Amino acid sequence: MRHIGPSLEDQQQMLLELGHRDLQSFVAAVVPPDILETTAPSSSLPEGCGEVQAMEELRLIAAANRVRRSLIGLGYYGTATPALIQRQVLENPAWYTAYTPYQAEISQGRLEALFNFQTLISELTGLPIANASLLDEGTAAAEAMSLSFAICKRPAAHRFLVDAEVLPQTLAVLRTRAEPLGIDLEVAEPMTFQFDAEVFGVLLQLPGRSGRLWDPTTSIQAAHEVGALATVAIDPLAQVLLAPVAEFGADIAVGSVQRFGVPMGFGGPHAAFFATLEIFKRQVPGRLVGQSVDAEGQPALRLALQTREQHIRRDKATSNICTAQVLLAVMASFYAVHHGPDGLAAIARRVLRLRAQLERGLHQLGYPVQSIARFDTIEVICREAPAVHQAAALAGFNLRVLPLGVAPEAAHGFGISFDELSTDQELKSILQILAEAAGQPVPVLEDPGNPHLEELVGLPLRQRPWLQQQVFHRYRSETELLRYLQRLVGRDLSLVHGMIPLGSCTMKLNAAAELIPISWREFAALHPFAPQDQCQGYQRLVQDLEHWFADITGFAGVSLQPNAGSQGELAGLLVIRAWHHSRGEQQRDVCLIPTSAHGTNPATCVMAGLRVVPVACDADGNVDLNDLASKAEAHAPQLAALMVTYPSTHGVFEPQIREICELVHGHGGQVYLDGANLNAQIGFCRPGTYGADVCHINLHKTFCIPHGGGGPGVGPIAVSAHLMPFLPGHPLAACGGEQGIGAISAAPWGSAGILPISWMYLRMMGAEGLRQASAVALLSANYLAHRLHPHYPVLFRGQAGLVAHECILDLRPLKRSAGLEVDDIAKRLMDYGFHAPTVSWPVAGTVMVEPTESESLEELNRFCDAMIAIREETAAIESGQIDPQNNPLRRAPHTLAAVTAEVWDRPYSRAEAAFPLAEQRQSKFWPAVSRIDNAYGDRNLLCSCPSVEELADNAVLKPPLV
């Protein structure tokens, strides 16, 4: 079983060191006996198999998807992923196995790619602050609504005005998110908006769903006059030609860069964006990359303004977004680098020209077409619509069915959206279909030659040069772009270099066989709103995963729609809330949360319209049962739920988990189990059988979807039978429960395009393989704790003195004895070739280590050797052998440039700095920059590449290093 790192012989050696004879007895000592299933539970999972067989089976499933040319639009478009980007980024483990770039000194490659992404978005929108991606356009619009609501200080302001032309999936997500917050959505034509003091924000769509282009300046000014913020949802390809929305007065711009080289993937994953004014920089959701300087005074990139994020602000955060869509944002940024501004403009002009020619053809054929400015889309209401759809289907095209959601044979109209893949031949085929349906000869259109922008007359167009930064012009040849990609990826530490022992993150193997199918056309090229008979492969994939996850977790039903763990949390709490409301218990609005919980939990509670009541933890890191009982009783009439992580965020199996669940149920509440640590449980205990009502599952942790440097993620929820009627639905697809909470993500099945990864993992492992993986994950964590405990105190242990799948090492004594902070240890680990464990969470001054089952005994020992060697270095400080200020830890990490500089004025040798372990002379990963000054970066926030003019005017500004 190649997924599991330690061999059987290595496992036996590890067990002997821990004093256990076999894995079965070891697991029995770790997992509380009242929840332990001593034999593998019956499972719908087939027996595990090899990668060849699994891939052959998945090929048959993929073949059931019939890919047609979809011109449906609605936010999803055909696009050409440059082969170099597909091969060197999407399919490159050095890009997709990295973690969120919290350790910036070893993350400079993807930070630069994200910096380029933010620059692209700022240039498109004209707004100075753009984040490093969001989950999808619907979520981005909802985040804009929440930000506008949070910023508005008028108590009476509760109305959010929405353009009637907004995308239907965006409107659905807005409705789901607005109701718990007490926001009233009003959908209307912008010219009929009724503005007063109750309005806190507006959302406009440009172009609109029907393709309409218009000047929103008047509507934005009207919003500003009553103190409301204006958000504009934009199409980035249209924005290439149009004036930046900042020139219309927009406060916020949102959208998706899917059509910048990211496949449709049946709805995702795609990178959304969020851009705004500088005054709102501390309210921006998600990650924000900023430029700072390192210890040598060189420019360096890092995540900026981190104190505004949910893991810091908790219930005071305006967003619960954690994982975003970094890998897809990176792809889109390289797409822009690949094409440059001229190439992007050429694509946009071609799309505009084809749409204009189609419109002329429609007029000639007698179809009723309204004369308005448009970009890529035309909608037509006509009696010939059923015949048009029938002929289009026979010719291999999917057109938009109007009204949305009806069957083609009942259609009153059709819509056509052109995209990057559209050609003159495609236009001719469409005109032939339309002519046949109308009983007219095919119109002959004159070749307009070089397309002009007369089709957009009357609209403000982009006048000034844009994307003038060198990076968008320098890499015109594939050779140069290939080398640029290689330079960047060489500045990032990922799983291709070594273990990433981040606690609560489960950085396990992402096998090549699991990743290959996501590039298959049958999965990558399918539109999420394609006719159901064309999507049978995806339906089978979804059905398999829903059944398997329900079995694994012990629940009755599953929704795959949430496209991140944060969205799984929100979906789970909203499902609980809807169940209470269905029983007439609207007063239940209290959520109990242990103080050790991840910051996402309290932030999510607030978004779900619940009040957070903290519950204390005892000295052993467990939920304090007395405090829980007291709080549950005090709030019994209002108790909605308890959010609990299991095993706990302190890395132990709490023995009283059944009692905790029963206590909450006894007071009328439901139990939401955060599935971040599910990797410790698979095959041995199931949340649905020991008392939980809802559990979210991180497929990007337990089930092998790679972290992608900060996304994509997938966060399905599994629920008990009584909650199934409330699972998330969608306006354009049959999914969810009869009383579903509404859409939580823009696409019906969320990030469906990466579900084949988890399917392959589950199919290859089988039930017994999953059980073995969890056992080895527990074994590896306890082996590390055993080896490191003589050098660093292990802060919490469960029964029999054992930890779960991770352990917390207490570094606080080093502050007292050697003046060292936990960051000093984290940065020094880079010199040893390791990414640091999770720093200062859940306990400040500690590190949380999670090795996973995929790391070999050799790699586990290499990490232990590094940590022990660092402890010896700290001991030298304690004994006075080395300077307490000027030493390898305080000045870590050490770059190649620093170590090879002509002048070396440090009281330790270059070898001690760069090669603390002898083995590193054979293979060494070098940090790209020295320690970064985070405070400087926040005080001097720079979130996009300076323009040529800015560089000329300000000698202080420097572009990134590469």
Curated annotation (Swiss-Prot):
| Source taxon at top rank | Bacteria
Parts forming coiled coils: none
Recorded GO MF terms: glycine binding; glycine dehydrogenase (decarboxylating) activity; pyridoxal phosphate binding
List residues modified as N6-(pyridoxal phosphate)lysine: K701
GO biological process terms, alphabetically, are:
glycine decarboxylation via glycine cleavage system
**Enzyme Commission code:** 1.4.4.2
A UniProt-annotated Pfam family: GcvP2_C
Q: Which reaction does it catalyse?
A: N(6)-[(R)-lipoyl]-L-lysyl-[glycine-cleavage complex H protein] + glycine + H(+) = N(6)-[(R)-S(8)-aminomethyldihydrolipoyl]-L-lysyl-[glycine-cleavage complex H protein] + CO2
GO annotation, cellular component aspect: cytosol; glycine cleavage complex
Q: Which UniProt keywords apply?
A: Oxidoreductase, Pyridoxal phosphate
Q: Which cofactor does it need?
A: pyridoxal 5'-phosphate
Q: Which InterPro entries match?
A: GcvP (IPR003437), GDC-P_C (IPR049316), GDC-P_N (IPR049315), GDC_P (IPR020581), PyrdxlP-dep_Trfase (IPR015424), PyrdxlP-dep_Trfase_major (IPR015421), PyrdxlP-dep_Trfase_small (IPR015422)
The record's function comment reads: The glycine cleavage system catalyzes the degradation of glycine. The P protein binds the alpha-amino group of glycine through its pyridoxal phosphate cofactor; CO(2) is released and the remaining methylamine moiety is then transferred to the lipoamide cofactor of the H protein.
User: What NCBIfam families does the entry give?
Assistant: gcvP, PRK04366.1
| Family membership | Belongs to the GcvP family.
**Protein name, entry field:** Glycine dehydrogenase (decarboxylating)
